[in-house]
Each structure stands twice: as structure tokens, then as C-alpha cells.
């Protein structure tokens, strides 16, 4: 189809490019005249392609079409006019001229928000749904018949830029191309616009963007974000006009600490804080703005309002002076109308536009591999000297990144001061949950509350997912070299090691883990896991594949291993930090971003980890931590359309429910590590001393709260009595007590509900006829302590033979001497298949049994010997997918095949 493209901007350029790819003939491009010697991106591209380009300053004079302009247009004989973004008024003689007429892109769901400031009004009026319309052009009042519409959710802190970049631009380009395709196929609809709900909103200009303070905080927030970046919502303080950018609504929380700032007409003084400027509505609610712009165009972080500029300019090294001149040359290439770039040259006063900001940022980033630079940084350092000082400071690591504000709960415990975050961690900040909702997390040693923890709500989950998506699609994490990503993960492991005693102490008081075990395993293996996967970051690679050639041409096929995107991770309460590390390390190494839900009863080490991740330099939005109810958070993550992968460790029933939700939703990739009833077979030819020692560890390690715990021991008859005698003797030596006591062997169970289930489990075993040899009851002391327990004479049909206790309960059954196949049949007679073990000195028997056992892990003459390099995961209803080892990366990668013909 012969098309005339009428419009301008990067959006117009992308539509033009895609139409060419579709095979359409663009017979002409009509765009705006050059500005300061620079062509509009649409016109510049078309000129390079040899397409006729027309740059009429106007199409009409005194309401009448200019005949010469119309004739030049008609000479092209276009069959369709496509107006992706057009700021000029096009006469109806041109609109109606082509065979198929004209189509226009409009960034709202018509008939709502007609007019040139549709995106602004969508946000200013707090619409929950936004989107765009492609309609058949009319006389300029946006009332033409609708061809196509697409909707998107408007996020609470969306600005004009974020909703445009996230949806209106990329999906709008696709929509324009689809609309042209429908027209070419003869299938394009013409749907009359409804009259109900129609609005025509005036254009937002600087003069009508003054903030009205006599309204609720949410309305003020919507007004500021609806004018961000153009024209900019403003107020007057003293004799200075201040324009606000980067608004976020604060739904609750305590009064902010900082310096007051009187704003005429405001409900109460604003407060300059470490994170921004807190403003108040007439309802007493709060919002915060990130940046302030002065009348001269200079922009600063709002948190710096009362601070003077750095007292002394940096003294540049010879290398930095050379770099400065290279950047000066880049400014000169952009500001072609300026004869010389002086230190005082102002980027914008010299004629730069928003597209030039993008170009400058990309040029500097190209010269400084790995430098994190954003468009807004240019607005904050508009003069050349300021810009160089800012870039050099950043290269030196003196970039003045905003300080992470943590409302710690401090505890004097374990001979140290432990500082514990307790809020949600979203987009690099600790914040309260919506409505200020909290719950108590309890110390199982004495049953007392440690602190109140924020309880995430649906809006918090959506905000976290949006932050993770933004970080993946547009943030530094997604653009970073894999080796640089690995360096950050190595740094994270180092920082975790520096804080290992504090992490282990928090783990002990929150989960009941014995401190020495927490230090070695809970925390120690977490550190090892991040180090291991840090090393994988730059070793993820595809392969080349020989395929049949399309003779006489040749073909090359190769594969790419790519990150999935936003991953939801849900972890259990038995190893709070280690389970986080097992999944998150592989996920991050693959290049994904994470929204993680720790167990509701053990959230504290995950929140401390979030704090340490900021210290390590992990960018905002890459890691998000949401404490709260699994039924709410886990369900929402499973249902959320922007989450592309769920990694879950927990019970089999919940795992099934998650898998179903992921299938019904957007067919997410899922990995599940579920329940277990791991068999441990001990033959009479074993090293009995070692078998007793490892058998006890297989059951009582970490109080039995161990996914691979030996749920059932099968003993050859000839050693049964001796084994039981020795185990009982060793159990009696175990010290039960405070997990922070270095001599303690056995700490409290994780939480009260679990303790009650263990008591009920043992009562069931006794009722069914199993012999309770030792334990079986709660320890008479404060806290959730349960005695190590031993059952014998357990037969296959009993409840305790089939169901997992997830506690310190040893279930012992006999089998006849030499009957290997029979004991294998009994061991495999379960729907679980997470782990297993065998003790024997006969290598042939060991290999035979390890082959026949239906489990993801088989331990031979050892138990619980997991390693970061060895894959971990189960069979059958114990789930699928692997943690640890190279195979874990597969859970967080997708494979793309690329075929080239040449």
C-alpha cells in the first residue's frame, strides 16, 4: 500500500520503520522544519532512505489550505495517510484525499480525554486504566470512528514518561502497524465513538500547571505526575518558582524527619528529608517528590534543597582532563549551532532538546563502560563544567547516591547490636505496607514478639512487580555486561560474609536455628551459593547447530540463552536465608529480576539481605522483598501477568495450587521443590558407628526441619536392636536449649502451629500401634521446644510411615536380611522422591540401590551432604526443577534459536 507518513518524533520514526518492514511503500514523509539546524528523527531517517521529505512550516493560512502544499501532497498519490504523532493542523483536503483516508494515533481510550494533553489528563484525574486509540481522522476534535484500542493498567506512581515508555510508545507502534495491516486486508472496522463519558481536555501549559494545595494528597500527587516532565507542576516559594518531578504517594507512616519548608497555601509545611521533599494535602496525607527544578532550568535532588553545592571543584587528573575534552567534543557534535563549548555553556540554553539528552547520555556511557547515567542527570548538571564534575565524581565512586533509609529495630543480643529492617523492600527502598498494616514475628525460643513487620497488600505486590519489570526492561541490570553482574554478586557475597554473625543471630532468633549451625550452614552456604553463581554470570552461552542448507544459499543456526524477566520466588521457613540464596543467586546470575516472598514467620534475614544488596550495588528494582501471607502474595505473584517464572519451595498441596494458577494465568515457567519422605536404607554390612552418627543427622539436623530429612529408616533385622540402642543413647546426650548458647545441640521448632502438628503426629503414631521409644512431647520450658523422638515397629500402612513430619522424629522399620529388592519396593512406595540414602560397604550393592531408588538425590554412606555445585531437586510429587549447580540456571533462562541465511 502507498502510504504518506505525516508527523514527527521518535514515535513517528519507529512507525515509519515498521511500515517499511511490513513491505508498504512510503511515498512521502511530511514533518516539521529543522530546529537549530537539526532535523526531526522521522525526517532524518526518511532522507537517509531516499524517501521524499517535506518540511512545511504550515499547511493552512487563515483557516484555508495552502494550494501549493496540497498539490505537492496530491502528486504523491498516497492511498493512506498515517499520522503517528502530528503537532500541525492538517487540512481536510489532505485528510480525505487518499483512497483509504487517514488514521491517527491518540494516547487515551477515546472518547475520554480528547485533546492534545491526553496522557497528562489520564494521570491528573487518577484514571486506573489508560491506553491508546487509533481512529479515522476527523476535523481535529478527536471524534472520528475508532479503528483499534489497547488498554493498560495505570500504576500508582506512573508519570507521563513511564507510562509512555512502558506501554504507549512500544505498543502504540505495534498498534499503528496492525491498523495499517487491517486496512490493507480490508478488515479495518469503523466504530462510532460513544457520547457517554466523553471529555475534551485543554492543553496543559506552564501557566495552568500551578499546584492547588487545597486538595487531598492523592490529588496533588496525580497533578504532579500528570505534568511530569512537561509542562511541570510548579509552586512559588519565596520569590522562586519551583517545579516538582518524581512524585510518589505515601499512603501511611510516621511524620518525616527533616527540615521544614514553608509553601504558601499548603496545608502544612513541607519537609526536606534524606529521600526527597515530603508534601501534604488538606487531608493530612503525604506525598514525596524526588527532584526540584529552578526557573533557570537547573534541577537538583529535592533532598539537597538546603545544601550548598560542593565547596570545592574537583581537580582533574591528566587522564580526566583528556576525558573532559572528549566529552566537550560530544557536546559540540550535538550543539552544532554553538561555535565553542565553554565551561559555562548551558546544554539547554544552547538549544538542546530531549532527544539530545538521550544522545548525550548514550555517548558518555559508551565512553565510560559501566557508568550508570540517567537522562535526569543531565537536567541536574546543565552547564558543561557541572556536567564534567558530576560524571567524574561518578567515575570516582563519589556520585552521592541517595542514602538508603532504614528504620531499624535494634537488639542487644548475642554480644552484639543487631540492626533489623522490618519494612517491605521495593525498588531499592524500605517502605511501609499499604494502610500501615503489620504483624508480629515471634522468637520461638520464648514465644515473644521480636518486632512488627510490614504486611504486604495487593497494591504493594503490584508495585514490586512493576519495579522489577522496569529494572529488567529499562534499568542498568538488563544492560549490564555479564561479567560486571558477576562482580556485583561477588561483592554481595563478601558483604554477607562481613555480616555473617549478625545474619546468623537474626536467623537464630527468628527461626530457632542453633547459632553455630546457622553460622556454618544457613549463612555459610548462602555465601557460598552467591559466590558460585557469581562465577557463572559470564559463562552462560548458547551453541551453533548444523542444519540443512537452503542451497544454493547457506544457513547458520545458533542459540541464545536469555533471562526470563521478572521472577517470583516463594521460600519456606526452615532455612530462611539459605532458601533465598539457593533460588535468588541463580536467578540473578541469569540476569533476571526478583520479587521474593519469605515465609511469613521468618522474614527478617530476607529483609537484612535486601539491605546488604544495596550496599553491594545491586540496582533499584532488581530485588524486592515482600513479607506477608502466602495466600495473598504467592497467589498474586502466580496470577500476575508480568511475572514470567515462579520458583517455589514448600508443601505439595500448595505447589499444586501454584502450578495450576500459573497455567491458568499466563502459562508461567514453574519450578517446584515440594514435600519429601526420604528413605534411608541401612544394611548390616555398614560401618555401624558412622551409620548411627549420620542416621541421627539425617533426622535431627536443624531440628528435623529439613526438606531432605530421612523420613523413614529401613534397618536390616540383624542390626536393628543395636542401632536403636545406640541412637537412644546418643539422643539422651543432646542438649536442648537456647539456640544462641554455643553448647546447644537442639533448638526450638520454628513456630507454635508446627509444634502442635508434631505433637498430633506423634499421638497418631502411638494410636496406630507404633512403639514410641523416646520423646514424643513438648519440652517443659518456655518456647516451642520438642523432644527428639524415636518410633520403632512402624509398618507400611501407618500414617507416620507415609506422611512427612518435618520435625525431629525418627521413624524406624525393619526388613529381612539380604532382601534388597523388597526393601527397595517399600522405600519407593511413596509419592515423594526428593532424597534418599544407603549405608553399606558393598560397592555393588550401593550402586544397585542408588540406581533403583526413585529420588532426585541419593546419599551413599553419608547424608545431608549438599553442595552448591551439585543439582538439588526431586521426582514425582516432590516436584521438578533444580536448585544449585549449573542445572539451576536452566530454571531461569530461556533458549532462543536464531537462523540466518546468507
UniProtKB/Swiss-Prot annotation:
Keyword Protease: no
Entry's Gene Ontology cellular component terms: cytosol
Annotated stretches, region: Aldehyde dehydrogenase domain: 417-902
Xref: CDD domains: ALDH_F1L_FTFDH, FDH_Hydrolase_C, FMT_core_FDH_N
Modified-residue entries (O-(pantetheine 4'-phosphoryl)serine), positions: 354
Annotated InterPro entries: 10_FTHF_DH, ACP-like_sf, Ald_DH/histidinol_DH, Ald_DH_C, Ald_DH_CS_CYS, Ald_DH_CS_GLU, Ald_DH_N, Aldehyde_DH_dom
Protein keywords: Cytoplasm, NADP, One-carbon metabolism, Oxidoreductase, Phosphopantetheine, Phosphoprotein
Role played: Cytosolic 10-formyltetrahydrofolate dehydrogenase that catalyzes the NADP(+)-dependent conversion of 10-formyltetrahydrofolate to tetrahydrofolate and carbon dioxide. May also have an NADP(+)-dependent aldehyde dehydrogenase activity towards formaldehyde, acetaldehyde, propionaldehyde, and benzaldehyde. Regulates reduced folate pools as well as glycine metabolism.
Protein name as catalogued: Cytosolic 10-formyltetrahydrofolate dehydrogenase
Organism in which the protein naturally occurs: Xenopus tropicalis
Source lineage: Eukaryota, Metazoa, Chordata, Craniata, Vertebrata
Gene: aldh1l1
